[in-house]
From Swiss-Prot:
Residues 1-93 are annotated as: RNA-binding and homodimerization. Belongs to the influenza B viruses NS1 family. Residues 1-103 are annotated as: G1P2-binding. Keywords: Host cytoplasm, Host nucleus, Host-virus interaction, Inhibition of host innate immune response by virus, Inhibition of host interferon signaling pathway by virus, Inhibition of host ISG15 by virus, Inhibition of host PKR by virus, Interferon antiviral system evasion, RNA-binding, Viral immunoevasion. Disulfide bonds: none annotated. A motif (Nuclear localization signal) lies at residues 50-55. GO terms for cellular component: host cell cytoplasm; host cell nucleus. Homodimer. Interacts with and inhibits human G1P2 conjugation by UBE1L. One of its GO terms (biological process) is symbiont-mediated suppression of host PKR/eIFalpha signaling. It is found in: Host cytoplasm; Host nucleus. This is Non-structural protein 1.
C-alpha cells in the first residue's frame, strides 16, 4: 500500500444533489430579479441564460431518478433555493430544508441542538487509502463473479450474463480477478436496476464502487452522483466491461482511485467532475 495515494470522492448522495440543484435554482432566481431591475450587464445576462439552460437540463435528468412524488419543477426549486440562502445567511439551525439539513458538529445525530457549533458540511476526513472506509450498502443475496482463470472475452460474457439475471432494485456485484499474478482485487459495485413492462432490465444508476486488495485494504473508491445514469442496458454492460478492462491492465502497483474514476466517468462524458489534481494523480 502506497502511503501517499489518495482516494477519489465524487459527490455523496441524494441529499447533497438536491441541495446543490435547489441552491443553484435560488441563485438563478436572484439573477432574474436583478435582470428585471435592469441591473445585469451583458456578461451577467449571459451567465443567467447559461445557468438556466444548465439547471433545466440537470433537473430533467435528476427527476428521472426520483419517484414521481418527489419530482420538482424549476419554479419549485427556486422557492426552496431562496429559503436555503436565508438559512445560510442567517445561520438558523432550526430552519431545516428538505435536502439541506443543518449538521451539528458536536452531535451529528441531533438536528436541533441549542448552543452548538453548526456547519453545513462536516470536515472531510483524511484522504489516505488506509483510512477506514465503509463497504457499499449490503444487498440481499449479492452476486459474486470469480474471473481468476478466464480470458477477457469469457470474463466479459460472464459479467454480462450475471448482470442480466439481476432483479429490479439495488444490486451488488463482487468481481474477483487476478492481475498479472500480482494482486487479486475485490470490486464491490452498488447500482440500481429498472424493470420494464416488456421484461427488459436496465442498469439505471451506478452509486458506488470500491476496490479492495487481498488484505482488505481500500485500493480505489468511486462514489457516483445521482444523475450519473445509464440510458440503456447496453450502456450498463459497457460500463462494467470498461471496469473489468481497466482492472485487467494489471501492473505491480495498486490501481489509483483517480484512474478508476476517470475510467467510469469517461463512459458518461463526465470527466469534468474530477478536479485537475485528481486527474493528474
Amino acid at each position: 500500500m502506497v502511503d501517499n495515494m489518495t482516494t477519489t470522492q465524487i459527490e455523496v448522495g441524494p441529499g447533497a444533489t438536491n441541495a446543490t440543484i435547489n441552491f443553484e435554482a435560488g441563485i438563478l432566481e436572484c439573477y432574474e430579479r436583478l435582470s428585471w431591475q435592469r441591473a445585469l450587464d451583458y456578461p451577467g445576462q449571459d451567465r443567467l441564460h447559461r445557468l438556466k439552460r444548465k439547471l433545466e437540463s440537470r433537473i430533467k435528468t435528476h427527476n428521472k431518478s426520483e419517484p414521481e412524488s418527489k419530482r420538482m419543477s424549476l419554479k419549485e426549486r427556486k422557492a426552496i433555493g431562496v429559503k436555503m440562502m436565508k438559512v445560510l445567511l442567517f445561520m438558523d439551525p432550526s430552519a431545516g430544508i428538505e435536502g439541506f439539513e443543518p449538521y451539528c458538529v458536536k452531535n451529528p445525530l441531533t438536528r436541533k441542538c441549542p448552543n452548538c457549533d453548526w456547519a453545513y458540511y462536516p470536515p472531510t476526513p483524511g484522504k489516505y487509502l488506509d483510512d477506514i472506509e465503509e463497504e457499499p450498502e449490503d444487498v440481499d443475496h449479492p452476486i459474486e463473479v470469480v474471473l481468476r482463470d478466464m480470458n477477457n472475452k469469457d470474463a466479459r460474457q460472464k459479467i454480462k450474463d450475471e448482470v442480466n439475471t439481476q432483479r429490479e432494485g439495488k444490486f451488488c456485484l463482487t468481481i474477483k480477478r487476478d492481475i498479472c499474478n500480482v494482486m487479486s482485487l475485490r470490486v464491490l459495485v452498488n447500482g440500481t436496476f429498472l424493470k420494464y413492462p416488456n421484461g427488459d432490465k436496465s442498469l439505471s444508476t451506478l452509486h458506488r464502487l470500491n476496490a479492495y486488495d487481498q488484505d482488505g485494504g481500500l485500493v480505489a473508491k468511486l462514489v457516483a452522483t445521482d444523475d450519473l445514469t445509464v440510458e440503456d442496458e447496453k450502456d450498463g454492460h459497457r460500463i462494467l466491461n470498461s471496469l473489468f478492462e481497466r482492472f485487467d491492465e494489471g501492473h505491480p502497483k495498486p490501481i489509483r482511485a483517480a484512474e478508476t474514476a476517470v475510467g467510469v466517468l469517461s463512459q458518461f462524458g463526465q470527466e469534468y467532475r474530477l478536479s485537475p489534481e485528481e486527474g493528474d494523480n
